[in-house]
Amino acid sequence: MTPKVFYISDGTAITAEVFGHAVLSQFPIEFEALTIPFVETIQKAQKVKQQINDCFITTGERPLVFHSIINPEIRNVIFSSECVDYDFLNTFVAPLEQHLGVQAKPLLHRTHGKSNHGYETRIDAINYTMENDDGQTMKHMDKADIILLGVSRCGKTPSSLYLSMQFGIKAANYPFTEEDMDNLKLPEALKRNKSKLFGLTIDPHRLHEIRQSRMENSRYSSLRQCRLEVKEVEMLYKKERIPFVNTTNHSVEEIATKILDITGLERHMF
């Protein structure tokens, strides 16, 4: 039977999800997960407790519960359910209080709420990235923190959005198209911002698979065209000394981490 998992919080549950995913990803099995945010009252906690207990009765196994609940009364209600409990925040808060000599003063939603000083930074970055996606405009490249380059469908847009949403980085991206291949070069707007350029590449066979699902049996999706574009773009990266990574079989999180590691871009943590 597939193990059941609950991610619970009196806030957004983002912290509980991130912690839980990081732990469970170490195990080569599938989990059935349910996220329950904003458990802010005893009444809501009692309902969640009943859900957990019902799950135990139905399956005969105690579900895993990852939570980041600040309110101790609400936390105790969840503790009393038939679950295997993993309390992310309080596991670390007490030792840190002792080490720092400072008592924690929890604020609900502090980590992901609007009150966070980085909220506007994140929103500005997301807006910038969406407005400068896929070379829609070249007018504001000077304002970018990074400009991702690559052929169509190599992962530019999801990587750009992840960088902006997760780290508040203004990430523009520019596509090299089929029409560019005869005389591939950097546009002037990119030349002016060469220090911000970062390339993405991909295995031609994987690119062929991705494009086939979008435009089957077209020149655009042919393996020959995919090989040509990847070859030409990689030659340009090397000629212009633009750093690049191969996105094949990597998640967007891994791609973004590689980009940050190579470029040394500042991460705005929220």
From Swiss-Prot:
Record's keyword terms, sorted: Kinase, Nucleotide-binding, Serine/threonine-protein kinase, Transferase
Enzyme class: transferase
EC id: 2.7.11.33, 2.7.4.28
Catalytic activity: [pyruvate, water dikinase] + ADP = [pyruvate, water dikinase]-phosphate + AMP + H(+); [pyruvate, water dikinase]-phosphate + phosphate + H(+) = [pyruvate, water dikinase] + diphosphate
Function of the protein: Bifunctional serine/threonine kinase and phosphorylase involved in the regulation of the phosphoenolpyruvate synthase (PEPS) by catalyzing its phosphorylation/dephosphorylation.
Protein name (database record): Putative phosphoenolpyruvate synthase regulatory protein
Record-listed ADP binding positions: G150, V151, S152, R153, C154, G155, K156, T157
Source species of the chain: Shewanella frigidimarina (strain NCIMB 400)
Family listed: Belongs to the pyruvate, phosphate/water dikinase regulatory protein family. PSRP subfamily.
Endpoints of the signal sequence: none
Example of a GO MF term: phosphotransferase activity, phosphate group as acceptor
